[in-house]
Amino acid sequence: MEKNTVTVPKTLFSQVIHIFKYAAINLGLPFLNGVMLGFGEIFAHAFIHSLGWAPGHTRIYSIQRHQYIQA
């Protein structure tokens, strides 16, 4: 018993659809992932700040200024 298989050539339209599908997965999902990570970081910072676990501002000390104050 032989099985008859018929191969249908891919049309240009189906190839274009596949290219867009793979591009959306490989380019769109990493972008969406980055956006969600950014929003999560903003939310976490706001949440921690509202609990009072972190100072309201960041202090940056310069070595030159520190040496200038000591002199």
Swiss-Prot record:
Where found, per UniProt? Mitochondrion outer membrane
Q: Which GO terms describe its cellular component?
A: MIM complex; mitochondrion
Q: For this entry, list what GO says about its biological process.
A: protein insertion into mitochondrial outer membrane
State the source organism's domain of life. Eukaryota
What UniProt keywords apply to this chain's record, in alphabetical order? Membrane, Mitochondrion, Mitochondrion outer membrane, Protein transport, Transmembrane, Transmembrane helix, Transport
Query: In which broad location class does this protein mainly occur, judging by the first location in its UniProt entry?
Result: mitochondrion
Transmembrane segment boundaries: 22-44
The record's note on what follows loss of this gene reads: Abnormal localization of atg43 to the outer mitochondrial membrane. Severely decreases vegetative cell population growth.
Instruction: Give the quaternary structure.
Output: Component of the mitochondrial outer import machinery (MIM) complex containing at least mim1 and mim2. Interacts with mim2. Interacts with mitophagy receptor atg43.
Q: Which PANTHER family match?
A: MITOCHONDRIAL IMPORT PROTEIN 1
Q: Which family does it belong to?
A: Belongs to the MIM1 family.
Question: This chain belongs to which protein, by name?
Answer: Mitochondrial import protein 1
List the lineage, top down. Answer: Eukaryota, Fungi, Dikarya, Ascomycota, Taphrinomycotina
